[in-house]
Amino acid sequence: VILSIFSIINYRHSKSLKDKIIKKCNDDTEIIIHMSDFTGFEWDKCIVYGPSTQTKDICDAFDINYNTYLDLNYGIIFIDNNNVTYEEFFKVSDYDFTNKIPEFIIYPYRQNESTQVKYASFEKNEAEFKCIKKHSDNGYYYRLYPIN
């Protein structure tokens, strides 16, 4: 029974959010994506955060019980009725040492915004992001910025 439940959860989230978004953005240099197009689970809000965010910041700001150590990552947390339903980290250190550029980052602030916040939340119907595909000497990397 436990193996069956694990298999269902693993199947449901078998491909990372990052991989799904990269696949969608792969043919374009810039597109608008809706986060709900990439999720197969219930959620009503997502929280996007940057590397200087502490777990306590998230708990206090959104009144949720969350105990994951965020470290120096970018990431996204999906919430449904104040419960975490899915989370994914985009490590700044997850890069090819020949490339030296993180492959994938979702920023909590708009592109070229003068005030760069540590985290931001987006209701499901407003979770739209501009996905920008950029070329480096050793391949491509992707940057997402909220448009709302």
Where are these regions (language model features)?
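Short, structured surface segments that line ligand/substrate-binding pockets
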Residues: 66, 70-83, 88
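N-terminal export/targeting and maturation segments
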Residues: 2-69
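A short acidic/small-residue loop/turn micro-motif
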Residues: 87-95
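C-terminal partner/receptor-binding element of secreted or periplasmic proteins
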Residues: 101-148
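Short, surface-exposed beta-strand/loop "edge" segments at domain boundaries and coil↔beta transitions
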Residues: 55-56, 84-86, 139-141, 148
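A short, polar/proline- and glycine-enriched secondary-structure boundary/capping micro-motif
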Residues: 96-100
